Amino acid sequence: MRKTKIVCTIGPASESEEMLEKLMKAGMNVARLNFSHGSHEEHKARIDTIRKVADRLGKTIGILLDTKGPEIRTHDMKDGLIMLEKGKEVIVSMSQVEGTPEKFSVTYEDLINDVQVGSYILLDDGLVELQVKDIDKTKGEVKCDILNTGELKNKKGVNLPGVKVNLPGITDKDADDILFGIKEDVDYIAASFVRRPSDVLDIREILERENNHNITIFPKIENQEGIDNIEEILEVSDGLMVARGDMGVEIPPESVPIVQKDLIRKCNKLGKPVITATQMLDSMQRNPRATRAEASDVANAIYDGTDAVMLSGETAAGLYPEEAVKTMRNIAVSAEAAQDYKKLLSDRTKLVETSLVNAIGVSVAHTALNLNVKAIVAATESGSTAVTISKYRPHSDIIAVTPSEHTARQLALVWGAYPVIKKGRKTTDDLLNNAVATAVETGRVTNGDLIIITAGVPTGEKGTTNMMKLHLVGDEIAKGQGVGRGSVVGKTVVANSASDLEGVDLSESVIVTNSVDETLVPYIEQAVGLITEENGITSPSAIIGLEKSIPTIIGVENATKELKDGILVTVDAAQGKIFEGYANVL
């Protein structure tokens, strides 16, 4: 099972039912809606279509609302475009004017108070660079030298690298969009241009005022101020998005990979999901194949420890949205297969802080690795159990069984977690039985698989992960007292006397008999296992089992009547249990 999650931006190229179905089948886990573009009516139509297709396919798909944020843009230019020439001067006005090569204006009136002589102003993702030469606060004008030639069109982005700006945490539009998201029951908010913890708390205040406790907040770190305040920002956040687009304009491009690794590591330490975004497969907007550099970029983000990787224009407006998702999926699967999970677990154990809940998580991960369990089944109300285990990046699949649709969609973004919605768990026994049955229903585990079940007891309390149980999936058909510690798989041969075994090939057989006498010994020596009804560790059955090092179970009531000839069984002498079929016992 692929463990790294894929976020796809939904736009004109991907909003149809047909294409959404293709993206979901290709590997999309979360649908991102960019509120920098489009009306509420357009986004509602997309949300409805996403949920309709997901329900039809039986998929759990999260929905992420990406705010426009408090960005700075230019106003309109004369004839829609002006040319700025290197070596000349241009005035940036705080009052709205029609842009000319001599003067244009910006949407942020306090820019004049934030910059100083020598500050840089970058236009249109850094394609045009200005340097502040003089500031005239009386006129509300900033005179700049033009450092390189370039075109400037209407409403282009403005970046102020290294400058602390006094923009609000969220705009009126953002607040309106968030209220819309609450009404439409979105799962996550990606908050654009977050600079300080108060920016996140402004959003949290809206959610709390609306009594919403389901939506999680992922600040987008896109500037130096956000990088500098990352520790405090993470304290009030549920996760993080490493938004490399504007970040690569605000800080030197060569610093972006270093910052990316640092931000991901900080999230990993706290066990908070992190998304790596922007230009991951950018060339696939135009071409059906990714470049080698892009493949390396996606893989290295996974090696860095990201929970999810994101596609932007590739799926929103590109020519090959389905191919982009498939490519990202294949890169993720390949990168995960090359991971050294033993080393990964060791590194995570050292990185993540010790706590009672984390102690269970790390124990689950170590046990899963040492015993090579097929899956970890996390029974969870809030999702915290699955998140706790995910911190340690276990090789085994994490099947998160939850009664909550909201929790399932939240887990769509968590590394390694496969959420399954299942109602009805009132007692601990119900919880365990329900978890096992649900895991089998997914097809990811089958009879004979060794799994770990983990949960919080009592049920329903967030952050109380405190239970771990090893469980063998399958039907236990009989039990008694085991002799020795081995296990074996074979077909039963029921024998009431030695004559029943004459001429029978016993090389892969388990003999089932009432008791053992000397006439049976030559046949028992040929068999792989022994099951008898007689009791006692000093009985002939126990003695012959020990002497011949044959996995033996004694004291199995009515064995010769209950166990039929020719059925495949697993004899587990360590537990004194007999399972139908093959069971992966220790």
Curated annotation (Swiss-Prot):
Family: Belongs to the pyruvate kinase family. In the C-terminal section; belongs to the PEP-utilizing enzyme family.
Keywords attached to this entry: ATP-binding, Glycolysis, Kinase, Magnesium, Metal-binding, Nucleotide-binding, Potassium, Pyruvate, Transferase
Phylogenetic lineage: Bacteria, Bacillati, Bacillota, Bacilli, Bacillales
Cofactor(s) listed: Mg(2+); K(+)
Highest taxon of source: Bacteria
Binding annotation for ATP: N34, F35, S36, H37, R73, K156
Pathway: Carbohydrate degradation; glycolysis; pyruvate from D-glyceraldehyde 3-phosphate: step 5/5
Residues annotated as binding Mg(2+): E222, D246
The keyword Magnesium appears for this protein: yes
Site (Transition state stabilizer): K220
Protein name: Pyruvate kinase
InterPro entries linked to this entry: PEP-util_enz_mobile_dom (IPR008279), Phosphohistidine_dom_sf (IPR036637), Pyr_Knase (IPR001697), Pyrv/PenolPyrv_kinase-like_dom (IPR015813), Pyrv_kinase-like_dom_sf (IPR040442), Pyrv_Knase-like_insert_dom_sf (IPR011037), Pyrv_Knase_brl (IPR015793), Pyrv_Knase_C (IPR015795)
Binding residues annotated for K(+), in chain numbering: N34, S36, D66, T67
NCBIfam families: PRK05826.1, PRK06354.1, pyruv_kin
EC number(s) per entry: 2.7.1.40
Gene source species: Staphylococcus haemolyticus (strain JCSC1435)
GO molecular function, one term: kinase activity
Record-listed substrate binding positions: R32, G245, D246, T278
Reaction it catalyzes: pyruvate + ATP = phosphoenolpyruvate + ADP + H(+)
